[in-house]
């Protein structure tokens, strides 16, 4: 059997030489050479003598030796590949961690053989066979790389080296030291830490930015919600205001409609008409409208020819009234100064009446003419255009006017009133504010015809007209069939304020108090005579306020500084205007013939 073993040893030696010559194994590697020559060293150590065991034992020993050799080869290959991997990682400055380096060493250790053959210039067929071996090797070591078993490595190293290179644990610690030295010497490891820190900082910054963006979005959403709520609240308030305005407009329209119906004799309370003995009929101009065609006074069927408002330019506001606001403006086509009266939302019938009356009075003395009627098509606002008048309130001029000036302007006013009455029209709102005086030109104009009405004898009219301080007694006791004499009472109140330096002369707080103020001057005898004549009566409240009084003497109301103005003919003229009974008052024509105007009335005699 010793011969057979020698023959087997020679064959093994030849195989090793062939493997080395072919380049499959590097004999200079410190890890592979002990594995290749371990059997030879063992044979020489034993002196070439073998025990005379049975053939079966020899076969078993040979098999065990072969297995050990295979294990040693595998372990040496692993060690060799680890070394090559360490070298390759040092050259490439790998940035992987410790565990990744170990797994990469195991996964790449089997390409050492193919790389060695390539350096020797071998053919592609050999490379393909080597690749097949590497595939098998990879399959075998894939299970090993999943779990790094240090005990298996210890056994393989100790068995392969045969004790010549020390124990397996010492080899393992050497490898781990090399790996640790490599990792400590590798600068990419510290770079990885810096990169990780930078990435963490970037992530923190991104998170902060995201938080800031979210906060900004939340703030924007809150602001948008607040703005939406504010807009909704504003819209709600605007809607409430518009609804209130509409309700007020409806109420005003209903009141105006009721007043208009009362004024036209359509609705009159029956208890007020009971006991009427005599109907009031004007003693002048009573049949003017009856002698005219219906189209002359029928403002209900009158159609207004509205023109474009763009012709006029508004400059500034100069006044306001109950039913309108007044602005100064310019006629763009002629560059003339104008006055634009912007009408508030009122009953359409009232606007038609005012325009119709102004057309009827066009060209009259001291009556402001209507230039144009315009309408804004977008807003539907209606306006009346008049020539510009340098308006000065007559009350502002009272201290600059002398006796002659007062006579002159009252006479000019009577001209306008008489012309109005001659056209069958009652002004119904004569007061200082509706009299425009340009004293430098000595020009007077009667303005504001919004309450004017056509007169028809025996017709009932609305008693809610004229300003309180200039209301005649017939309006205060609800006498609906009044006539032109209403304007003459208002003129008397205005004249009393001028010559007696007391405006308003009858300064009542309400309608009943206004009647009481009149009674204190004119007494109760003439009042009761007036009421009895026309079958009128006082209300319970009026009866409780009014007590029997004598008529006052006009001279007691004259201030000493106005002796030159309040002359006897002026007092007589005033006394004939302020009468309870409308039939006893002077008409406009009669007033102009009064001796008070003897210096001016030659033209009308």
UniProtKB/Swiss-Prot annotation:
Top EC class for this record: transferase
Keyword terms of this UniProt record: ATP-binding, Glycoprotein, Kinase, Membrane, Nucleotide-binding, Serine/threonine-protein kinase, Transferase, Transmembrane, Transmembrane helix
Reactions that this protein is recorded to catalyse: L-seryl-[protein] + ATP = O-phospho-L-seryl-[protein] + ADP + H(+); L-threonyl-[protein] + ATP = O-phospho-L-threonyl-[protein] + ADP + H(+)
Binding site for ATP: 318-326, 341
Domain named Protein kinase: residues: 312-597
The UniProt record lists the keyword Transmembrane helix: yes
GO cellular-component term (any): protein kinase CK2 complex
Gene3D superfamilies per record: Phosphorylase Kinase, domain 1, Transferase(Phosphotransferase) domain 1
GO BP term (any one): DNA damage response
UniProt protein name: Probable serine/threonine-protein kinase DDB_G0286481
Localization of this protein: Membrane
InterPro entries: CK2_alpha, Kinase-like_dom_sf, Prot_kinase_dom, Protein_kinase_ATP_BS
Residue ranges with Basic residues bias: 105-123
Key word ATP-binding present: yes
Disulfide bridge positions per record: none
Glycosylation sites: 53, 92-93, 97, 101, 127, 280, 390, 601
Enzyme Commission number(s) of this protein: 2.7.11.1
Active site: 429 (proton acceptor)
Organism: Dictyostelium discoideum
GO-annotated molecular function: ATP binding; protein serine kinase activity; protein serine/threonine kinase activity
